[in-house]
Amino acid sequence: DQQSDSSLDDGSDVPYPFTSCDELIALCEKHHMSIADIVWANETAMQSAVQVRSELDNVWRVMRRCVQHGCHTSQTVLPGGLNAPRRAPKMYARLASNSDVLARDKKRADAVLESSDAAWVDLFALAVSEENAGGGRIVTAPTNGAAGIIPAVLHYYWHFVDHANEEGVITFLLTAGAVGYLFKRNASISGAEVGCQGEVGTACSMAAAGLCAVMGGTPQQVENAAEIGIEHNLGLTCDPVG
């Protein structure tokens, strides 16, 4: 399952074409719209609102099932010759004190924060990464190699932010999609081409933008969050160490 980046490259079929973040922010300011609003308008110019919403809901559904399966699987060792153990189920049991936080589906009071919220974000990302390594169903967000980051941050929003709701999830995905589109159009999201900065860096930038948006950030603040997300991944390669 792949998130759509169908705000067309030439912009010919959308009401708010943009090819850079400067252009995107200018559109937001001119039309008094959020980044998510801009992307929604562009997407619904090419297909029905019902179809766009259905596809976004499906992305979120697959992400949730992926995290849930990664945290509950009975498989103890990942396939392949390395005999790498799955760590997410034990980590989940420890953080949730052997209860089922994911099944109860809400919120901060249901979770035991043994160290920090970051431990839960780590868990969610690890669960997706292990599902990917085990041949499970994931969302390429934006790639297989970086598939854990966006679901992890989105699950943090869903489970630990008091005002989280379904509309916020849609806003998150639309905003993240705009950032991913700009990276794909102007640079690369391919680890084989530009190293891990192109995969993990892009995913980090997308997730930062999405979280900033659902926490009430302005388009300028969302842009800044996205920039900080990629800045600290620039130069990150995929070279093996050891």
What do these predicted regions represent?
Residues 21, 28, 66, 71, ...:
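Generic recognition of cysteine residues
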